[in-house]
Design a protein with these regions (language model features):
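Short, polar N-cap/turn motifs at the start of nucleic acid-interacting alpha helices
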Residues: 190-196, 267-268, 288-307, 314
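N-terminal DNA-binding recognition helix of tyrosine site-specific recombinases/integrases
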Residues: 70, 82-84, 98-129, 179
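Catalytic-site neighborhood detector that most strongly recognizes the C-terminal catalytic loop/helix
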Residues: 143, 201-205, 297-322
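Short, basic (Lys/Arg/His-rich) helix/loop patches that form interaction surfaces
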Residues: 158-161, 254-295
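Basic, Lys/Arg- and aromatic-enriched nucleic-acid-binding interface segment
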Residues: 132-181
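Active-site/catalytic core of tyrosine-dependent DNA strand-transfer enzymes
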Residues: 213-267
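DNA/chromatin major-groove-contacting recognition/catalytic segments
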Residues: 209-214, 218, 222-223, 310-328
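Basic/aromatic-enriched alpha-helical hairpins
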Residues: 26-99, 118
């Protein structure tokens, strides 16, 4: 007689808090709800990032914080360090895609999370991120020519249409030397004074000053009664709530730009980055020196600016790159 033994192993999850109602149901079932030996990821990681100080650049810290906030929106406050698994990361990656986040941005989040988890645990986190995209893919052309900008500018729209706001934002970004959408969203009225618009880039903290042009003032004047923010995108002073609003508005903005392109008969793909890249390209064609373009964009390294201009088939790029290399 042959005896067969079957063993069942049960893992009991005891609630550490309430399951996140916004998380996919199957993920809630995977999250150990109480794990005293495993601290909560978000609050622990924030402490770790704040302790890094000058050991990492400001832009790197911002990347870490942005990725952590994004993961918190997906998985909630109660996610513990030990809860992060391949299953969760793959589901998070799919969620990012569903939110309209580009593959390169998703990859940036994943690389940041991998680095933070490695610093928190002291362990090799490479296996944990196996199968999750952490590379850098070549992006499609982001810049458009001056004729496309003029066509968008001349499009007939109702003054109170949401698309009119989207167009104003696109044009303002172009007029303000490629001002990023996130910085327009958080721009406050007190940052505009004595004919200057002054802001610090959210991504790097770089201070940028732009001379206020009449076309910029015209756009600003349309939203005078909307509150402390220059544009009617954010409606709270709470940092986390404002960030969540920003993400929602970013998704709206990208969708609105696609509608604007359709109405204007524009074949190029318009995104939140298009105006910024288009300004850089126009400045380059106007023979503005590369260091000046870099300063206007808030790039500390002109090499970063070259990535904006790489799509231009122009021998001057090669010469500019040689000059940059010879500087160091």
């Amino acid at each position: 007689m042959i005896k067969i033994s079957i063993h069942f192993y049960f893992r009991v999850n005891i609630t550490h808090g309430r399951p996140n109602p916004h998380l996919n149901p199957h993920l809630n079932s995977h999250l150990p709800q109480q794990r005293p030996s495993s601290p909560r990821l978000y609050e622990t990681a924030l402490q770790k990032v704040s302790q890094m100080g000058d050991a990492v650049s400001r832009s790197t810290r911002e990347n870490y914080l942005t990725a952590l906030r994004s993961l918190r929106r997906f998985a909630g406050e109660n996610l513990c360090v030990g809860d992060v698994s391949q299953t969760l990361l793959h589901s998070y990656e799919r969620w990012l895609t569903g939110q309209g986040i580009s593959r390169n941005t998703s990859s940036c989040y994943m690389r940041s999370l991998r680095a933070v988890l490695g610093k928190l645990t002291g362990a090799d986190t490479e296996p944990l991120f196996k199968g999750v995209y952490t590379g850098r893919c070549t992006t499609e052309k982001r810049a458009v020519g001056e004729e496309t900008v003029r066509r968008l500018k001349g499009l007939k729209l109702s003054a109170h249409s949401p698309l009119a706001l989207a167009r104003d934002l696109f044009l303002f970004s172009f007029y303000a030397q490629g001002m990023p959408f996130v910085d327009m969203a958080f721009l406050r009225r007190q940052q505009i004074a004595r004919g200057q618009l002054v802001y610090h880039r959210h991504k790097t903290g770089t201070r940028i000053s732009v001379a206020l042009q009449p076309c910029m003032q015209t756009i600003i004047s349309r939203y005078q009664a909307e509150g402390d923010y220059v544009f009617p995108l954010l409606h709270t002073a709470d940092a986390q709530a404002a960030y969540n609003e920003y993400l929602t508005q970013l998704n709206w903005y990208n969708r609105a730009l696609k509608k604007l392109a359709q109405q204007a008969g524009i074949k190029e793909n318009l995104t939140s980055y298009t105006a910024r890249h288009s300004w850089a390209t126009a400045a380059y064609h106007a023979n503005v020196e590369l260091p000046v373009i870099s300063k206007a964009l808030g790039h500390s390294n002109p090499q970063t600016t070259l990535t904006y201009l790489r799509e231009i088939d122009d021998h001057r790029l090669e010469a500019a790159n040689r000059r940059i290399i010879n500087m160091v």
